[in-house]
């Protein structure tokens, strides 16, 4: 393969890349979001400067990607922390677990999503929306909500989805020294909300050394939502360089 052909490739292996080129369109992307109150000292230990914490809140989320161009069907779960950067409110993506290798690869390589392999599920059990997250063979989170008890305003649902996402991009040199260390922003703007609901909600987190969601313990459920929407994943941009 010629050099000018090599540099045109998006990823490796050269003849079978880990993921295709975007844009990545999500049809009927299903969100189960729970905002809960946690310990402020615990948040201070994990939120990187220059992000600022407004309140001791965390959003636990499970998302079912039923139909994603180029990436297929998969489920994702994790924690996001409401923060602000230069006065702009958004969510710092703390950790994410999903069951799809192309989605893990594209999230880490083309952007800065903190994705690891995990086994989340989102399903309806009788009258209950259920979200679970397993790491390996162990359960680390169980979330439940009454199924479609109360309609949520579509504009409110859209506002939840369209908040800026702040992420860390860290890539070392081959000797382990810092090569890239950046704060990244990606904000979804292309979204169509089909349904939005809320209801009575509970969330359990369990201790795990390699999936430490419970380091941000649940003290009080603040709000919850169940949303179906079409979105297009945005491109990320660098907003802060730690090495300059």
Swiss-Prot record:
Q: What are its E.C. numbers?
A: 4.1.1.4
Which principal EC class is assigned to this enzyme? lyase
Keywords on record: Decarboxylase, Lyase, Plasmid, Schiff base
- Catalysed reactions listed for this entry: acetoacetate + H(+) = acetone + CO2
Q: What induces it?
A: By linear fatty acids (up to butyrate).
Q: Mind telling me which residues the site (Important for activity) is annotated on?
A: 116
Keyword match Lyase: yes
Recorded consequence of changing residue 115 to C/Q: Complete loss of activity
Name the active site residues. 115 (schiff-base intermediate with acetoacetate)
> What are the recorded GO MF terms, alphabetically?
acetoacetate decarboxylase activity; identical protein binding
Quote the InterPro entries the UniProt record gives: Acetoacetate_decarboxylase (IPR010451), Acetoacetate_decarboxylase_bac (IPR023653), ADC_dom_sf (IPR023375)
Q: Kindly state the subunit structure of this protein.
A: Homododecamer.
- Which NCBIfam families does this UniProt record tie to the protein? PRK02265.1 (NF002614)
Q: What does this protein do?
A: Catalyzes the conversion of acetoacetate to acetone and carbon dioxide.
Q: What is this protein called?
A: Acetoacetate decarboxylase
């Amino acid at each position: 393969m010629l050099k000018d052909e090599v540099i045109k490739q998006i990823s490796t292996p050269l003849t079978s890349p880990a993921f295709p080129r975007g844009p990545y369109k999500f049809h009927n992307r299903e969100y189960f979001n729970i905002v809960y109150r946690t310990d402020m000292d615990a948040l201070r230990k994990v939120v990187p400067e220059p992000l600022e914490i407004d309140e001791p809140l965390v959003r636990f989320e499970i998302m079912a990607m039923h139909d994603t161009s180029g990436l297929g069907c998969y489920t994702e779960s994790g924690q996001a922390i409401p923060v602000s950067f230069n006065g702009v409110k958004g969510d710092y993506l703390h950790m994410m677990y999903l069951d799809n290798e192309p989605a893990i690869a594209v999230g880490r390589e083309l952007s800065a999503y903190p994705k690891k392999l995990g086994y989340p599920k989102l399903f309806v059990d009788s009258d209950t929306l259920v979200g679970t997250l397993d790491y390996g063979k162990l359960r680390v989170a169980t979330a439940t909500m009454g199924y479609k008890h109360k309609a949520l305003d579509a504009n409110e649902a859209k506002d939840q989805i369209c908040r800026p996402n702040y992420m860390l991009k860290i890539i070392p040199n081959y000797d382990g020294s810092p090569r890239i260390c950046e704060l990244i922003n990606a904000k979804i703007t292309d979204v169509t909300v089909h349904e939005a609901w809320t209801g009575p909600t509970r969330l359990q987190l369990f201790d795990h050394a390699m999936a430490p969601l419970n380091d941000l313990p649940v003290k009080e459920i603040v709000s919850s939502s169940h949303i179906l929407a079409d979105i297009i994943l945005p491109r990320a941009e660098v907003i802060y360089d730690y090495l300059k």
